[in-house]
Amino acid sequence: MSPHLNIEVPLRPAKSAATSIQDIPRTLNGLPDELLLRIIEQLSAQRDLYATCLVSRRMNKVADPVLYKSIAFDEPHHHLTFSKSLITRPRRGSLIESIHVDYPGSELSDFMHMNHSPVSNRIIDPFSRTISSMSNLEHLKISVPESLCKGIGTLFNGPFDLACLRSCSLFYQCEDDGYWDLQDNIQVFSHPTLESLTIQKARLDERGFDSLEKPSETDLRVLHLIECDINDDALSDILLHPDALKEISITQLETPYPPLEEAPKYVEDYILALPQHSIESITIDFPSLRGKNALRLREFEALKTLKIRDYQLFGQASPRLHSVGFPPILEILHFLNRIGQDEEIAELLAYTIENKEIVARSIRQMVVANEEHDLPWVIEEACAKSEFQLQFG
């Protein structure tokens, strides 16, 4: 018997190299959707992405999650064109996570008076309807004419609209450069998932929330009020509901225009409106607010950063019968004006520096708007005695 095992195996014709190559897709259109989407996500330049989507309708459809993740409308007809596209692709709205809408009122005015406008004079409804279709929207930035204010405000009333919203910026342009009525968008403060809110050039009177409208606790962490005319009682009302507001900034021009009607005269009124248990950073860059008495801030148990003017902190009443009550863990004190223009304030600040370990032991950084050679002598001497260095900026 032969020592070798012989097994007869039927021979198959070898597959030609040409046949193997033919099995491999030669075009992008031959790739599966999942792989196409991976390729599209790797495109770094927007123009490359757009060019790729012009290759075919399939490419355009596959790229929807990337194309519509973040969009911007800078002309009125853009959002109307997008609104029409939702008729054939209703799920497209749910792909959007960030939207920025910014166009001048003059453009909207011209567009609304076009004879063949698809919405006649009712541009507000399709606009708000388009935004409401974005069920996964997280970031909303609005800078549009005041005529759209009420329509957009309705988005914050519904329990299901914008359910994932995390940050929002609202600015409605008035023809006379005036303040828009925040009451029309007041429900934005009741949004349960909103964490960061910026309001620009708005006015709010003492009404705040009506009794039936008041929300439950919200997640608002950061609030910026830019060039606003806000009543202090209304501010107190709308800040009752954020469970853990961490940061607030209130800024205004040196000479507000139009003149203020609702804002208080004294900085104390705004300070009293703020939540004491949670806030960590306060910025009040509002030159026209006066300081009646020295601020008492000891109850602000979490406050670490304070940006303010010296006359607002130490007060302008004379004689000054009370000293500043600094927060227990305040670390950064930033003066937004040149300190020491008032001699009495300069002496009070010098006393604070000399006795920092007693009256403000947690302060590790004090920033002033002065130049280094522009400090009052009494403050220079106090810094030298206590070996404390100011920062200039």
Please give the residue ranges for each predicted region.
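Hydrophobic regular-secondary-structure patch
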Residues: P25-N121, C149-G151
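Leucine-rich solenoid repeat modules
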Residues: L5, I39, S288-G393
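Conserved beta-strand elements of beta-rich interaction domains across eukaryotes
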Residues: M59, H78, P104-S106, S147, ...
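Leucine-rich repeat
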Residues: H79, S83, L108-H277, S288-L295
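CRL adaptor-proximal regions
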Residues: M1-G30, R38-Q42
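Conserved beta-strand positions
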Residues: F73, V101, I142, L170, ...
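Alpha-helical scaffolding within the catalytic cores
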Residues: T81-I87, V267, G315-S323
